[in-house]
Curated annotation (Swiss-Prot):
InterPro entries: Beta-defensin, Beta_defensin_dom. The keyword Signal applies. Pfam families: Defensin_beta_2. GO terms for cellular component: extracellular region. Disulfide bonds join C27-C55, C35-C49, C39-C56. One of its GO terms (biological process) is defense response to bacterium. Residues 1-20 form the signal peptide. It comes from Macaca fascicularis. The gene is DEFB125. The keyword Disulfide bond applies. This is Beta-defensin 125.
Amino acid sequence: MNLLILTFIICGLLTQVTKGSFEPQKCWKNNIGYCRRRCLDTERYILLCRNKLSCCISIIISYEYTRRPPFRVIHLEDITFDYSDMGSFTGSPVSKLSDLVTFDIRRETMTPKTNTPETTMPPSETTTSKTTMPSSKTTTSKTTMPPPSQMALTHN
């Protein structure tokens, strides 16, 4: 019984080895060429394979290989742009700072007697530490959220 199983295994491996050795070796992209000593009249030399063999690719178009589909034609009428976010554009250069942000202007001074910081507000200026957003004519809701780039500047 063991001898029978061993012969089946050897026969199976032998068929795999003979397929690889008697068939011409494939080469080039997606294995469309064959490695030969001399290319046929309907083939063209591309590069060298192992053991001084040439990689030969057929000149005649073969339909057994899948070809790349042609590029789609893009018409200019089909291209559209979304201008919905252009209303929030301020026209400022790339400074990343918006005019909608107010900064807290407090002056800190050191008292010479106690060496503690003392914060004073100028009497004519009244500012808040929160970000103020002007009311927009295009929004219908009462509460307006600042843009995502300004979310870090808001203090809730």
